[in-house]
């Protein structure tokens, strides 16, 4: 499988697990049949052992021969899926609802595909940026017009900043119509937060009740997109007490749903998104803070597994 250890936590976490003598297997869903009956699907996972993992050289990891195992042999399953949440992901992931409750799944379906990362912040109005989900062109126009000067429009099911647009609140209707035609049937409108220009976008990564670390994403010159895939750079910034209070509230709410590993995004003091299908930046957290957040993550996994 192709890996990019600049963004992908799998290499550093696998290395830490192997250094502790913990066996790690890798399941590539492309090699499995999503249309199997659930019992057969879970009893016949085509996995390969991860023999070695090292982000400093290629290949970044070494895999053993493929073999078939039953899901019940595992203590922890770490799921990772680059957005968007598509039909193939759901068809695979729904099978894991039936996995034994004794297995710690990071993160567990069906919440992984029933909830939206872009809108889940609306559950926490005390902390979140003002957000409207528009399911018609008329709603989009009204939401944009309601903003003070500028609105942030984003598709509901994209990633890496794809489709994010900064729109004047008095934009002509043909501009909004073109955006709607491209990204319908649902578009999210958020208030524009000027803090993005001064202080970027802070990602705080949590696992259970443990904060793994944080990293500030600073937009490139001339850009307002604070996404590392869109040219932003990583920098160090400590979370504020209010941001940490938000993390605690969100974790306490979502952990019981099976969403344990979370990437919370803040512009200033406002929560803008909560990532749970593929929350990255563990590598950048290590780099800018000079820590080993992967070790903290594995420590927390062991505590959570022990109950």
Where are these regions (language model features)?
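Short glycine-enriched loops at secondary-structure junctions
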Residues: 109-113, 217-220, 267-270
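ATP-dependent carboxylate activation and anion-phosphoryl transfer catalytic cores
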Residues: 238-307
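Conserved N-proximal alpha/beta basic substrate-recognition cap immediately N-terminal to
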Residues: 2-21, 25-133, 139
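Residue-level detector of anion-binding/catalytic polar loops
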Residues: 23, 104, 150, 210, ...
